[in-house]
Amino acid sequence: MGKYFGTDGVRGVANKELTPELAFKIGRFGGYVLTKDTDRPKVIIGRDTRVSGHMLEGALVAGLLSTGAEVMRLGVISTPGVAYLTKALDAQAGVMISASHNPVQDNGIKFFGSDGFKLTDEQEAEIEALLDKEVDELPRPTGTNLGQVSDYFEGGQKYLQYIKQTVEEDFSGLHIALDCAHGATSSLAPYLFADLEADISTMGTSPNGMNINEGVGSTHPEVLAELVKEKGADIGLAFDGDGDRLIAVDEKGNIVDGDQIMFICAKYMKETGQLKHNTVVSTVMSNLGFYKALEANNITSDKTAVGDRYVMEEMKRGGYNLGGEQSGHIILLDYITTGDGMLSALQLVNIMKMTKKPLSELAGEMTKFPQLLVNVRVTDKKLALENEKIKEIIRVVEEEMNGDGRILVRPSGTEPLIRVMAEAPTQEVCDAFVHRIVEVVKAEVGAE
């Protein structure tokens, strides 16, 4: 991670850390780095439903136009929609304005290259070097060489038509409950599933600029679970603010997380000869039960650091086509170049249709170990990881576990948090281990 770029682009409190002035520079320098070898380059921009999206979009557009780029605004669209359209529309770069599952005051800017993939560390470092220069020495075209802006609000429909083709039959006869987090999928997902002839119930589809992720979406699936039970739905599908995550709910109201969705997809893809190299790529946060279920089905796993960019890097390196995170980022690389909540949802419902099994049965083939994750707000993430007392309590707890479970303590990639996670044979043991570590972290580096 650099000074500006975290694990998922540039993030911060809009108009405080992520200011219009910074957004202008990111547009100008980012646009230059990604398009400098092209005459009259095309850059597309999408955003989620945050109130700050218009402000940052205007600044970004100005920065891009100042380099001579032609800018196409997509309006409100999901992150994977931008990734797909960057390549499909032959753009030199794509930009998404979103802070994903974060609260409304936050926002972020992430770039995609012409291939639809997120930027490499080297590209981000090149942009950061320009941001840190005292004098802007980039070319400043004038007159007819300046860029122009246009709108392509039909882009969302083009993207939906593409992902719709990935399923084998329609969803008639199924009742699907959708939670769109008052975010980027609010107008897209209901249209998609209705178009596939499903009976749908919806929530989180009334964005007002202020309510994105507020008590809804993939970080609050328990709310969708109530709707599933109330409506008697066959499945619930919860997306996050920018539509790159999926958390599901089975017909009984049980939450089905990213690990379980990955396992269901892996098993089906193996059975149908689609799973490349018989391997799934996951992160260190995946549940022990996930690995045991894969092992029982003779499927190999490959483990990375936390963050969908690291999963993607490993997938590209090894030629794998399925990967993801417990949080619901599922990457289906045969179809799209980033985590995609709606695409993952289509595949999950398609598997239900093709196997004629309810989601509870499909998910039930994986038994999760009890797990607890506690976020501790800290003054300094780096200091926390170097603190001797914190290192000592982790060592003591790991010794006591004696291999029957695991502890993971790591910094958040986007917030001033230390995440403390444990898995153990019982919830009681799990909770006790986590709280012992949390108390030491709070005492040593906790923020008020």
Swiss-Prot record:
Query: Mind listing the UniProt keywords for this protein, alphabetically?
Result: Isomerase, Magnesium, Metal-binding, Phosphoprotein
User: Which free-text remark accompanies the cofactor?
Assistant: Binds 1 Mg(2+) ion per subunit.
One Gene Ontology CC term in the entry: cytosol
Q: Which residues carry this modification: Phosphoserine?
A: 100
- Catalytic activity from the UniProt record: alpha-D-glucosamine 1-phosphate = D-glucosamine 6-phosphate
Asked if the Swiss-Prot or TrEMBL record annotates the protein with the keyword Phosphoprotein, the reply is yes
Which ranges form a coiled coil?
none
The biological processes this protein is annotated with in GO are: carbohydrate metabolic process; peptidoglycan biosynthetic process; UDP-N-acetylglucosamine biosynthetic process
The UniProt entry, under NCBIfam families, shows: glmM, PRK10887.1
Job description of the protein: Catalyzes the conversion of glucosamine-6-phosphate to glucosamine-1-phosphate.
Can you name this protein? Phosphoglucosamine mutase
What is the species listed in this Swiss-Prot or TrEMBL entry? Bacillus cereus (strain G9842)
